């Protein structure tokens, strides 16, 4: 609903425009129970690993080594009780363009955690029910659009799809197929 959403939506823009990445610094200020739990280093580490992996799967160094091999990526979450359920996310993105010209992108995302999460939970319940009625069982990759960590079969070394627009195409295709129609979105 916040930091990962911004990364999964904005990193494809950087990659599509072939902009280089020098660094991405993200921090969240949370005052709810989520912030309190993540204030513990052991709990934060799990979240940090999932947030860091989002960029690596979208801005793939092997595909464009001159643009994405050596960038600095830092993630922080800060508990601040007066914030309550209001979430504030800051992202500073240092990019470079043609001829190595440095530029910056700043994002200040102010939102309410529960208000962002509640409709996603409802959609997950409804779409899970639809999948069960359609006879779909096991990993439901099309639900990744709603999740921080995309659904994938890690036992088969399947690569998760973190790219928000690809996740959306997968979701639309699955809904069309469950409705008896052919998929109409290509995933590239």
What label would you give each PLM region?
Residues 2-70, 74:
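Conserved anion/nucleotide-ligand pocket segment
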Residues 40, 48, 56, 62, ...:
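Glutamate identity and glutamate-enriched acidic tracts
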Residues 47, 53-136:
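C-terminal and late-domain segments of enzyme folds
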Residues 96-188:
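C-terminal active-site/capping subdomain that shapes the small-molecule cofactor and substrate pocket
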């Amino acid at each position: 609903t916040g930091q990962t959403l911004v990364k999964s939506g904005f990193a494809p823009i950087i990659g599509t425009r072939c902009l280089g990445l020098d660094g991405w610094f993200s921090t969240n200020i949370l005052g709810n129970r989520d912030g309190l739990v993540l204030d513990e280093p052991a709990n934060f580490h799990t979240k940090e690993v999932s947030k860091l992996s989002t960029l690596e799967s979208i801005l793939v160094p092997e595909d464009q080594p001159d643009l994405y091999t050596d960038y600095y990526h830092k993630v922080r979450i800060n508990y601040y009780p007066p914030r309550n359920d209001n979430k504030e996310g800051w992202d500073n993105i240092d990019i470079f363009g043609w001829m190595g010209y440095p530029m910056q992108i700043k994002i200040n995302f102010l939102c309410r955690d529960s208000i962002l999460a509640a409709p996603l939970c409802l959609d997950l319940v409804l779409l899970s029910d639809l999948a069960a009625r359609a006879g779909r069982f096991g990993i439901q990759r099309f639900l990744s659009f709603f999740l921080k960590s995309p659904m994938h079969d890690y036992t088969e070394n399947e690569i998760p799809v973190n790219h928000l627009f690809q996740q959306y195409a997968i979701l639309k295709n699955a809904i069309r197929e469950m409705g008896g129609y052919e998929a109409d979105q290509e995933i590239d």
